[in-house]
């Protein structure tokens, strides 16, 4: 793979790199400055010699433009020097994963979890309304704003694993559900359907969010320290719902049970 490491003050289009923010299997994210407007922004990069995830992410961000207060603004994309693809978007603040870890007891209050739940559900609904499923809902892909204007806004990030489930704006014309689908997502937060190789639907995004909210309130999930994927799946099937949801509000049990019964074609209410 081509090395696409960027240096401080390096130019990518009209954007100048300030520092690296994060790095993962698909590439890296940098804090940068728009030299035209002097605004802070984020640049995601990937090597040109790998299957592009930024192409999907750029497309989703463009589709969400003006349709969701929970999506970063798309600022540009392109290819540089034949070595890297890049995507530029607004810069957000700390991830919910970082905020959760920074708590002394690793717990958010009931009120905080409720506020986060509302915004996360809104963010997923906005995504679903344009015909896409996220497929990797987790605390690291959710963040708050970084300015006084948006520091209470939750943003949903990283659409590299997103998949179109409908080409119809009304979401009535669904793509056929596949069988034996490869695992997509993060083991800790994936729904049982994902472990079983089923096509992910809108309800699977929300089931992942349920696991996230439980972790926020309880500090951890029962399988947090389990490394074996099959054992995690077994624990998810075996644990009583009442035990899993004992630290969150009672209404979560009803919602979890309803989501667990849904199929790919079903629209969560």
Role assignments for model-derived ranges:
Residues 28:
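Conserved N-lobe ATP-binding subsite of Hanks-type protein kinase domains
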Residues 143-184:
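Activation segment/activation loop of eukaryotic-type protein kinase catalytic domains
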Residues 97-108:
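AlphaC helix of the protein kinase catalytic domain
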Residues 73-85:
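Short beta-strand micro-motifs within the conserved protein kinase catalytic domain, predominantly
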Residues 116-117:
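Activation segment signature within eukaryotic-like protein kinase domains
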Residues 82-95:
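Conserved short submotifs of the Hanks-type protein kinase catalytic core
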Residues 128-146:
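Catalytic-loop of the protein kinase fold
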Residues 34-55:
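ATP-binding glycine-rich loop module of kinase domains
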């Amino acid at each position: 793979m081509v090395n696409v490491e960027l240096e401080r003050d390096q130019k990518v289009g009209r954007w100048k790199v300030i520092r690296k923010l994060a790095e993962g299997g698909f590439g890296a994210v940098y804090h940068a400055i728009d030299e035209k407007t002097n605004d802070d922004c984020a640049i995601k990069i990937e090597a040109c010699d790998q299957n592009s995830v930024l192409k999907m992410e750029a497309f989703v961000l463009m589709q969400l433009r003006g349709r969701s207060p929970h999506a970063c603004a798309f600022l540009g994309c392109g290819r540089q020097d034949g070595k890297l693809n890049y995507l530029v978007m607004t810069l957000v603040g700390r991830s919910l994963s970082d905020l959760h870890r920074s708590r002394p007891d690793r717990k958010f209050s009931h009120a905080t979890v409720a506020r986060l739940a509302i915004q996360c559900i809104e963010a997923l609904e906005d995504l679903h309304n344009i015909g896409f499923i996220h497929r990797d809902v987790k605390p690291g892909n959710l963040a708050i704003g970084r300015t006084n204007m948006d520091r209470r806004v939750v943003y949903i990030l990283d659409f590299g694993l997103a998949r179109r489930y409908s080409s119809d704006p009304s979401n009535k014309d669904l793509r056929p559900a596949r069988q034996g689908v490869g695992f997509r997502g993060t083991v800790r937060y994936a729904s049982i359907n994902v472990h079983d190789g089923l096509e992910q639907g809108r309800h699977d995004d929300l089931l992942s969010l349920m696991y996230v909210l439980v972790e926020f309130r309880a500090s951890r999930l029962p399988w947090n320290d389990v490394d074996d994927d099959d054992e995690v799946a077994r624990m998810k099937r075996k644990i009583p719902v009442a035990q899993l949801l004992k630290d969150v509000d009672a209404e979560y049990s009803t919602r979890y049970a309803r989501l667990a019964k849904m199929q790919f074609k079903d629209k969560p209410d």
